């Protein structure tokens, strides 16, 4: 076998050079889970201004377990600290965290140990269900929906969808489930794919808002204007 051949070659090499040190191959070693820890702090004025531009209030952040953090750790190593020029937030989803640095580069904006089972906003839904549930692509948009009077959830990342067993359970409680993804090539493609696969209606932010998602539309156009549009758009599902 390959293992026997490797052991025999190792014995030969050691006879030739007894002082040689070798290390065991680790390519089959399973990946260890990243442990993320946080140190919370009160919301600063910078934080309040940042979330206010999306129409999201502090009480809503608290409801959805969003924290301002001094720093976070990965496997007990400090990875980043809060700065007023680069604020930092932790989304707690059940027992895991998603770190969000909105002003950082796209390479360091996110850090997460969520799995696809960690559906954002799921724990905050009314247990009895209701009329309309929106599946969107971020917790920020989930919170915008909540501020506008609608219930919403988001998958753990933009590359996954709601697990089928969770979706099945939601179908039994919600009369209408809709998809609201980004108005860009990727978002529209994935929304239509999931719409066809799961037979769920998909819709997108109106082009007139010149924004790709709900939170950006609020930032650019104002909360009440976008809320009126959303209410009117969803009226047909009443």
Language model features with spans:
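Non-catalytic accessory segments of DNA primases and related replication-initiation nucleases
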Residues: 1-73, 96-115, 147-148, 160, ...
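TOPRIM fold recognition
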Residues: 128-133, 139-238
């Amino acid at each position: 076998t390959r293992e026997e051949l490797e052991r025999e070659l190792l014995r030969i090499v050691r006879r030739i050079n007894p002082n040689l040190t070798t290390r065991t191959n680790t390519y089959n070693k399973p990946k260890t889970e990243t442990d993320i820890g946080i140190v919370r702090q009160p919301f600063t004025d910078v934080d309040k201004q940042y979330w206010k531009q999306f129409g999201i209030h502090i009480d809503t952040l608290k409801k959805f377990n969003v924290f301002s953090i001094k720093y976070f750790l990965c496997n007990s190593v400090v990875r980043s600290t809060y700065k007023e020029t680069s604020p930092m937030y932790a989304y707690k989803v059940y027992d895991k965290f998603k770190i969000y640095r909105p002003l950082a580069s796209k390479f360091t904006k996110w850090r997460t140990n969520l799995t696809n089972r960690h559906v954002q906003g799921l724990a905050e839904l009314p247990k009895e269900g209701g009329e309309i549930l929106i599946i969107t692509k971020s917790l920020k948009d989930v919170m915008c929906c909540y501020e506008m009077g609608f219930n919403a959830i988001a998958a753990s990342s933009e590359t996954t969808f709601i697990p089928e067993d969770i979706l099945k359970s939601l179908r039994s409680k919600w009369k209408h489930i809709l998809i609201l993804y980004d108005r860009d090539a990727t978002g529209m493609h994935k929304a239509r794919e999931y719409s066809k696969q799961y037979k769920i209606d998909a819709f997108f932010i109106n082009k007139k808002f010149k924004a790709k998602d709900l939170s950006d539309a609020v930032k650019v156009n104002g909360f009440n204007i976008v809320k009126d549009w959303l209410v009117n758009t969803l009226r047909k599902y009443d």
